[in-house]
Amino acid sequence: MMRFLPLSWVKRTGMLAAVAAGLLIAGTLGAAADPITLGSASTYGLLLGTNETLTANGFHVGGDLGLSASDKVNLSGYLTVSGNAYIDGTPSVSGGGSYSVSGSIVTQSMTAIDAAANSASINAGALTANLSVAGNAISVNSSTNSIVIKAITNASENVLTISSLSLTNGSITFDDNGYTNAKFIVNVTGAFSMTNAALIKGINGASGDDIIFNIEGTGTTVNLNGNSSTSLLGTILAPQRNVNLGGGGNLTGALIAGVKNAGTSYTVNQSGSGYNITSLGFTPRSSGGNVPEPSSIALFGAGVSALIAARRRRKR
């Protein structure tokens, strides 16, 4: 038999349903995914995976140097390290150059550190892109050309996934765009080169510790052969690539290469005229959840007010 409920009960039920809806909408925003982090690999200006060969010919590394098991060092010129050198085992050293380490030389396993860097690459590559560029690639090859990448959030990473990146004599600018401590992830699945007078800069708060260039998979050699005008920002993360660099360029960030080694011997080849890495490795964003949008907050407040009013009428 159908029951007819009192109108007062129906009104209260409807109001409580509206309140519940307000609570649900405010709650569906949820928390952002865990931030991308390099973990124990974050202090390294230069980190090489196992069985890798480093050729240095006027190479300065700011921060720490990490050499993994079975690595080889060919000193064609000098290699200087302003932090500590962490070495897994005894690397093979050849050539007539020299090296100096301002801090300590520490022997330790690098396995977990390499794994942390590789995990960062995998996690970054799994992010859904929320930025885009025409043609799904960046090609800036003239000093009169430039591209600006603007942040759209600081509650999660600003992610751009492209098929290739070629920067020659032009510039890429990262813009925090009014957000505080925005983070940028640029996933590159194909060729990657920043050569000649390539320039990467940050404005409105963006800096080298906010940017990762995540060069995914196996493929062509990462080309960082510049000149004295080359100035780059960010952590260059290339777990399965060879890297060439030189020509007097400067990277404010870090270079991490070969940390996903499945039997391949990768190389980092620094040619003449020097190269300088000033350590400012990637720092993760805050792990706090998303801030609800003002409309959601207003709806939540309205729901609470309605609930209070309903209870007062009920008491009467």
Task: Specify the residue positions occupied by each region the protein language model found.
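Compositionally biased, intrinsically disordered low-complexity regions used as flexible
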Residues: 1-4, 301-303
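Bacterial N-terminal signal peptides that target proteins for export
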Residues: 4-17
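Bacterial N-terminal signal peptides
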Residues: 14-26
